[in-house]
């Protein structure tokens, strides 16, 4: 796949990036370089390789998925400029 100057201009417009007319050839060439690298990645044989999220194996502690209130209400409301009856109090914004 090859990116021409008009496609590069369209991509720049969609990304809301202002690109001068004389910079379009360089931008198109950069896009082509990136696409070439992606095509190289597509040629890599990954058959039998398990997907991973990190290069180092990680095991997370498992816990029961239970809903709690966190027992932090007093600490959280201590930061509020105005709290009433266990809730944040805010000024009325709708008439």
UniProtKB/Swiss-Prot annotation:
<comment type="function">
    <text>Allows the formation of correctly charged Asn-tRNA(Asn) or Gln-tRNA(Gln) through the transamidation of misacylated Asp-tRNA(Asn) or Glu-tRNA(Gln) in organisms which lack either or both of asparaginyl-tRNA or glutaminyl-tRNA synthetases. The reaction takes place in the presence of glutamine and ATP through an activated phospho-Asp-tRNA(Asn) or phospho-Glu-tRNA(Gln).</text>
</comment>
<keyword id="KW-0067">ATP-binding</keyword>
<dbReference type="Pfam" id="PF02686">
    <property type="entry name" value="GatC"/>
</dbReference>
<dbReference type="GO" id="GO:0006450">
    <property type="term" value="P:regulation of translational fidelity"/>
</dbReference>
<dbReference type="GO" id="GO:0005524">
    <property type="term" value="F:ATP binding"/>
</dbReference>
<dbReference type="GO" id="GO:0070681">
    <property type="term" value="P:glutaminyl-tRNAGln biosynthesis via transamidation"/>
</dbReference>
<comment type="similarity">
    <text>Belongs to the GatC family.</text>
</comment>
<keyword id="KW-0648">Protein biosynthesis</keyword>
<protein>
    <recommendedName>
        <fullName>Aspartyl/glutamyl-tRNA(Asn/Gln) amidotransferase subunit C</fullName>
        <ecNumber>6.3.5.-</ecNumber>
    </recommendedName>
</protein>
<dbReference type="InterPro" id="IPR036113">
    <property type="entry name" value="Asp/Glu-ADT_sf_sub_c"/>
</dbReference>
<keyword id="KW-0436">Ligase</keyword>
<dbReference type="GO" id="GO:0050566">
    <property type="term" value="F:asparaginyl-tRNA synthase (glutamine-hydrolyzing) activity"/>
</dbReference>
<comment type="subunit">
    <text>Heterotrimer of A, B and C subunits.</text>
</comment>
<keyword id="KW-0547">Nucleotide-binding</keyword>
<dbReference type="GO" id="GO:0050567">
    <property type="term" value="F:glutaminyl-tRNA synthase (glutamine-hydrolyzing) activity"/>
</dbReference>
<dbReference type="GO" id="GO:0006412">
    <property type="term" value="P:translation"/>
</dbReference>
<dbReference type="InterPro" id="IPR003837">
    <property type="entry name" value="GatC"/>
</dbReference>
